[in-house]
């Protein structure tokens, strides 16, 4: 335990909290070529690679991911949620934060139903999370 004299000389420091999605905290001023710290909920980017990845130990699957070059100049790995997708190289996508626990290095999700990403076909429940429109049969109500 520190004495009062020690605390007067050198006060306690606050712990610096590290961001779980650092690419969303950075902004790039292209006119002045300066990086500023301004956080945003989403970022736009261009797919540089689309592929599949195998998850960590107890799980087994082929999870779809995309390497995305963001507007702030950073390149990140983003998960493509839902069944089936239309993404390919040079597709423009919107990413949000949120990691995939069993894929190392994947800290972001691609938002379905925006920009070049289509929504999930034949999705009935939790449609807004997958960018799916309301089915025609339900619209009569």
Swiss-Prot record:
One of its GO terms (cellular component) is small ribosomal subunit. Residues 118-141 are annotated as: Disordered. GO terms for molecular function: rRNA binding; structural constituent of ribosome; tRNA binding. GO terms for biological process: translation. It holds the Pfam family Ribosom_S12_S23. InterPro entries: NA-bd_OB-fold, Ribosomal_uS12, Ribosomal_uS12_bac. Signal peptide: none annotated. Keywords: Ribonucleoprotein, Ribosomal protein, RNA-binding, rRNA-binding, tRNA-binding. With S4 and S5 plays an important role in translational accuracy. PANTHER family: 30S RIBOSOMAL PROTEIN S12 FAMILY MEMBER. NCBIfam families: rpsL_bact. HAMAP family: Ribosomal_uS12_B. Part of the 30S ribosomal subunit. Contacts proteins S8 and S17. May interact with IF1 in the 30S initiation complex. Belongs to the universal ribosomal protein uS12 family. This is Small ribosomal subunit protein uS12. It comes from Mycoplasmoides gallisepticum (strain R(low / passage 15 / clone 2)). The lineage of its organism: Bacteria, Bacillati, Mycoplasmatota, Mycoplasmoidales, Mycoplasmoidaceae.
């Amino acid at each position: 335990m520190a004495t009062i004299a020690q605390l007067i000389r050198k006060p306690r420091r606050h712990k610096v909290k590290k961001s779980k999605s650092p690419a969303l905290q950075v902004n790039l001023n292209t006119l002045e070529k300066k990086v500023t710290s301004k956080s945003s909920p989403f970022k736009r980017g261009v797919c540089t690679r689309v592929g599949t990845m195998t998850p960590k130990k107890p799980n087994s699957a082929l999870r779809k991911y995309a390497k995305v070059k963001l507007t702030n100049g950073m390149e990140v790995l983003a998960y493509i949620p839902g069944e089936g997708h239309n993404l390919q190289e040079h597709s423009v996508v919107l990413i949000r934060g949120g990691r995939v626990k069993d894929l190392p290095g994947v800290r972001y999700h691609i938002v379905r139903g925006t920009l070049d990403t289509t929504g999930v076909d034949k999705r009935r429940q939790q449609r807004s999370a997958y960018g799916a429109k309301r089915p025609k049969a339900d619209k009569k109500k």
